[in-house]
Amino acid sequence: MYIEMIDETKQVSQEMMEQTIDLLNFAAKTIGKEDKEMAVTFVTNDRSHALNLEYRDTDRPTDVISLEYKPELPIAFSQEDLELDPDLAGMLQEFDAYIGELFISVDKAHEQAEAYGHSFEREMGFLAVHGFLHINGYDHYTPEEEKEMFTLQEEILTAYGLTRQ
């Protein structure tokens, strides 16, 4: 899976970025999404607050914002169009591959790691997997959805080696 990494905070180590990429690739393999593309941006609480207000109409910072890419209308071209412009077929594959982006608040990750008594690495991993599952259609609005999503995210984190301890 191709993952574009952006650190707006300038606080995320190269090792943490590599762990995030590795973990998301592991999660993608687990749910059969290895051929997809996404972006992860590490942000401050101020930026998280602004994004949360803009996209969720919630006036406070949050730990992770998941923006699933769902084109409203399918992009369709005729066979003739595709034959006349070979780059068009490649471009369509790229659109189909892009699943969305995550904005992870580094500030919130530090706060929550301390509050929950586990490592910053575990919290960053949790937020990445949680957001990744959201952009792949998982949610936790109902008890059934919550059980499915939370069980899967814990299985991924444990299998990867990021336990709560």
UniProtKB/Swiss-Prot annotation:
Its cofactor is Zn(2+). It is an enzyme of class 3 (hydrolase). The gene is ybeY. SUPFAM superfamilies: Metalloproteases ('zincins'), catalytic domain (SSF55486). GO terms for biological process: rRNA processing. It comes from the Bacteria. Keywords: Cytoplasm, Endonuclease, Hydrolase, Metal-binding, Nuclease, Ribosome biogenesis, rRNA processing, Zinc. This is Endoribonuclease YbeY. It is found in: Cytoplasm. Zn(2+) binds at H130, H134, H140. Single strand-specific metallo-endoribonuclease involved in late-stage 70S ribosome quality control and in maturation of the 3' terminus of the 16S rRNA. Belongs to the endoribonuclease YbeY family.
